[in-house]
Amino acid sequence: LSTISQALTPSPSMILETIQPEIVYAGYDSSKPNTADNLLSTLNRLAGKQMIQVVKWAKVLPGFKNLPLEDQITLIQYSWMCLSSFALSWRSYKHTYPQFLYFPPDLVFNEKKMHHSAMFELCQGMHHILLQFVRLHLTSEEYSIIKVLLLLSTIPKDGLKTQAVFEEMRTNNIKELRKMVTKCPNNFGQSWQSFYQLTKLLDSMHELVSDLLEFCFYTFRESQALKVEFPAMLVEIISDQLPKVESGNAQTLYFHRK
């Protein structure tokens, strides 16, 4: 009976795959010129919609509800940019050729749009992550677990309210990633190397996101002068996150130290 029960019980990776957020649309108006303010405002509106989906996703993550609401909010605030850019690379990997960035179905960035957006170098950074997906032949199972680990990779320097519960959830997901690469037939005899490469990918996301946040905070401060719009959801998140990050209160949990 226990064997049947185990066979019928979905694995953690299967659960994570089934709860992935729906793809949302940017509402991109192709009749407007591709100026930096129009493109950035559209991306901000998209990010606001995506954050609603991220909150819904986080709520049903195994173990996340064991954290107090304050800790849940803190983790989402610290990781939103990481989650958004990682999901962007995944969509680009699945739906386009490697030279494009697939923000939503109605707004795909080619090199021309990257230049027009005033964030060409940042787009190149996101494109580099996409190329890592291609090189690693990233699977949906690996993507799903790494995404959870990104949610759990930045915390306040003085820790969370329930640090022990957080550490247990993070440890469980690290173990699941180890288990997954060990079972993968493509990784036979090389599971340690696959785990190393996947965790290096995870660490590299934080380096990119540091630059993305710097640009985001700048456009947020200068939004009126730059004519860049921010939806209410992002205003709330950034207003709370910005002083914490710039005061050095955010601690990133790396797998590898340089």
Swiss-Prot record:
The lineage of its organism: Eukaryota, Metazoa, Chordata, Craniata, Vertebrata. Aldosterone binds at residues 44, 50, 91, 219. The keyword Signal does not apply. Keywords: Cytoplasm, DNA-binding, Lipid-binding, Nucleus, Phosphoprotein, Receptor, Steroid-binding, Transcription, Transcription regulation. This is Mineralocorticoid receptor. It is found in: Cytoplasm; Nucleus. GO terms for molecular function: DNA binding; steroid binding. Progesterone binds at residues 44, 50, 91, 219. GO terms for cellular component: cytoplasm; nucleus. The gene is NR3C2. It comes from the Eukaryota. SUPFAM superfamilies: Nuclear receptor ligand-binding domain (SSF48508). Pfam families: Hormone_recep. Residues 1-6 are annotated as: Hinge. Belongs to the nuclear hormone receptor family. NR3 subfamily. InterPro entries: NHR-like_dom_sf (IPR035500), Nucl_hrmn_rcpt_lig-bd (IPR000536), Nuclear_hormone_rcpt_NR3 (IPR050200), Nuclear_hrmn_rcpt (IPR001723). SMART domains: HOLI (SM00430). Residues 1-238 form the NR LBD domain. Receptor for both mineralocorticoids (MC) such as aldosterone and glucocorticoids (GC) such as corticosterone or cortisol. Binds to mineralocorticoid response elements (MRE) and transactivates target genes. The effect of MC is to increase ion and water transport and thus raise extracellular fluid volume and blood pressure and lower potassium levels. Phosphorylated. It comes from Ovis aries (Sheep). Residues 56-59 are annotated as: Important for coactivator binding. Composed of three domains: a modulating N-terminal domain, a DNA-binding domain and a C-terminal ligand-binding domain. PROSITE patterns: NR_LBD. 21-hydroxyprogesterone binds at residues 44, 50, 91, 219.
